[in-house]
UniProtKB/Swiss-Prot annotation:
Pathway: Carbohydrate degradation; glycolysis; pyruvate from D-glyceraldehyde 3-phosphate: step 1/5
Name of this chain's protein: Glyceraldehyde-3-phosphate dehydrogenase
Protein family (similarity comment): Belongs to the glyceraldehyde-3-phosphate dehydrogenase family.
Native source organism of the sequence: Mycobacterium avium
Enzyme nomenclature, EC number: 1.2.1.12
Protein's GO biological process: glucose metabolic process; glycolytic process
Length: 339
């Protein structure tokens, strides 16, 4: 069955999700159709930003407008909505939408996201950490907990999707007592281009000119997908002046002693086995630009593994836009199987 999708919010993640879907469709791995997008931006701007992208380049499809409310991408026609009144006002039922990808960043609590269900959708996937959701899913880590009964689903954050495979391998193989992480993260639209007012006074500073320390909920969110680690991890982010391509540094106290070789072997086995497609193993001395447009959630850098006694440091890269958007596509496919 083809899963019919509506996208609410056609910004960075909404457009990346659609591009990732096109890429997977070309490979024959996604039976998903986007039937509508909703955004308060005018349709000509949406079409232009889909066609031209500063990171991903030009979309290899013709993109045009048909009438006032249809975006044409190659052979596909997408209904373009401009509903401002909130999720409950969207015509998902009339359009036969099965799953909504909620990517505005505005409706991340269950009470607001439920409006999509009231409007006729069967499931909602929030492309961000959420509150009061039915389940948070990180593919490869706890997707077995999704049983079809949950209607409001969070795909967690890009950083949690990178961190969770690290913690899973370490905890499964050696046991984690506690840990601290840092994500060195590309800047995002939540930061200022130039110094200006912001509720976070560090994010108030010019994103392209500074290393900006700020918060991340990624470590604490691990407890949602690995309950045995609840309260055992914490950390923060350092936003850096690049547009995409981030890296997570995790230092953990292990229950069992392990060498660098033991840890690297465990990650290589996981990348080639149970976490294939989610976790990637690298021995090459890579830098951030090398992993841009890599679809994996977590790209393990074996050359950076360090161990002192029972304390281990592991590092994994991730394209915080493209990798995450590919997991959104995969999660839509997973949810679609339960419809």
């Amino acid at each position: 069955m083809t899963v019919r999708v509506g996208i609410n919010g056609f910004g960075r993640i909404g457009r990346n999700f659609y591009r990732a879907l096109l890429a997977q469709q070309e490979q024959g791995t996604a039976d998903i159709e986007v039937v509508a997008v909703n955004d308060i931006t005018d349709n000509s701007t949406l079409a232009h930003l889909l066609k031209f992208d500063s990171i991903l380049g030009r979309l290899p499809y013709d993109v045009s407008l048909e009438g006032e409310d249809t975006i044409v991408v190659g052979p596909a026609k997408i209904k373009a909505l401009e509903v401002r009144e909130g999720p409950a006002a969207l015509p998902w039922g009339d359009l036969g939408v099965d799953v909504v990808v909620e990517s505005t960043g505005l409706f991340t609590n269950a009470a607001k996201a439920k409006g999509h269900l009231d409007a006729g959708a069967k499931k909602v996937i929030i492309s961000a950490p959420a509150t009061d959701e039915d389940i948070t899913v990180v593919l490869g880590v706890n997707d077995d907990k999704y049983d079809g009964s949950q209607n409001i689903i969070s795909n967690a954050s890009c950083t949690t999707n990178c961190l969770a495979p690290l913690t899973k391998v370490l905890d499964d193989e050696f046991g984690i007592v506690r840990g601290l992480m840092t994500t060195i993260h590309a800047y995002t639209q939540d930061q200022n281009l130039q110094d200006g007012p912001h509720k976070d006074l560090r994010r108030a500073r010019a994103a392209a000119l500074n290393i900006v320390p700020t918060s991340t909920g990624a470590a604490k969110a691990i407890g949602l997908v690995m309950p045995n680690l609840k309260g055992k991890l914490d950390g923060y982010a350092l936003r850096v002046p690049i547009p995409t391509g981030s890296v997570t540094d995790l230092t953990a106290e292990l229950k069992k002693p392990a060498s660098v070789e033991d840890i690297n072997a465990a990650f290589k086995a996981a990348a080639e086995g149970r976490l294939k497609g989610i976790l990637k193993y690298y021995d090459a001395p890579i830098v951030s630009s090398d992993i841009v447009t890599d679809p994996h959630s977590s790209i393990f850098d074996s050359g950076l593994t360090k161990v002192i006694d029972n304390q281990a440091k592991v590092v994994s890269w991730y394209d915080n836009e493209w990798g995450y958007s590919n997991r959104l596509v995969d999660l839509v496919a997973l949810v679609g199987k339960s419809l």
